[in-house]
Amino acid sequence: MSAKTLENQTALLQQQEQQLRDAVSLAIEIAQKAGAAAEVGGTKSGGLSVSTRLKEIENVEFNNDGALGISVYLGQQKGNASTSDLSPEAIKNTVEAALAIAKYTSPDDCAGLADKELMAFDAPDLDLYHAADIDVDRAAQLALETENAALEFDKRIVNSEGASFNAHTGVRVYGNSHGMLQSYLSSRYSLSCSVIAEHENQLERDYEYTVSRNINSLESAQWVGENAAQKTIARLQPQKIATQQAPVIFLNDVATGLISHLASAISGGSLYRKASFLLAHLGKQVLPDWFHISEKPHLIGRLASTPFDSEGVRTQDLEVIRQGILQTYLLTSYSGRKLGMQSTGHAGGIHNWLVQPNSSGKLTALLHQMERGLLVTEVMGQGV
């Protein structure tokens, strides 16, 4: 790995970061001169994706995207506009477009910037960016090694849906007329594989993946490929089970989907629209008393870590569920005002939910403890 290459990558991102900061500052300045409050978010991202299928390179993709999103407030009238052109003239035209839109919108008592005292003026460095010296050849090698490991694992693996390696880096900048201007760099790397197994003319498929901010923290290509094959083979020879009452364990990927329904039900948008099954449940028992969820937005280097939300509100540790009791709603500034409450820093979503286990063992230990029951590996359909 070339240290010079990594330095150049980082220097380029830092240059883009400064360009975005300048663009955000200019947009806010133009809006303020027109008598409006403003918030501006800027992003710049680039990446490489290489996929293989049946031991041959199938696709190589490069991406390079950037945008500036501008929201202005004339009193409580709001206008939005965006541009991918960061020239001063384009920024001026975009702000003017947002102002023109705002003049034709109806006033909304809940519209406006998030409260100034909630801003992340002192946003911490969460170590979200790790440069990697990765090119097409190395990315293809990783994908091919992954797929080969899966195909060679067992003769029942008869086909492949492919393997892929993805590398992504980006810059995020946010500013508003409260004087907030913060930014950070980020990276994300992933390696995945999906294969097909056959037994007595019955086909099954499954997959495996690894993802991290740091390429050196990814699981090996061998691990991803063999796990994809092993999970696929485990699906062969399915059997019907008799109707019965039994304990149930959800695999972590499936459980994440279930927990996302909880997050949606306690989000401010669902609550003020009265589209939630947990209306008026704050402080009430919603889950078993052994169930706990906490949110940790500032964990170093984690995928869902962020120092501030998409409104610039400082993120903070929260207890979401404690002993089965709902401790907080998930609010933006708008939904908070609709409900007569304060933003909780959730514009843009949730950040690192940690489910505290009620058992010290991992899956194998849980299965031994269950003795006989149902392990749910996949669900179909929508809703809960």
Model feature map: region roles:
Residues 61-74, 182-210, 320-322:
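Short beta-strand elements
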Residues 83-85, 208-209, 332:
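Residue-level structural signal for beta-strand termini and adjacent loop
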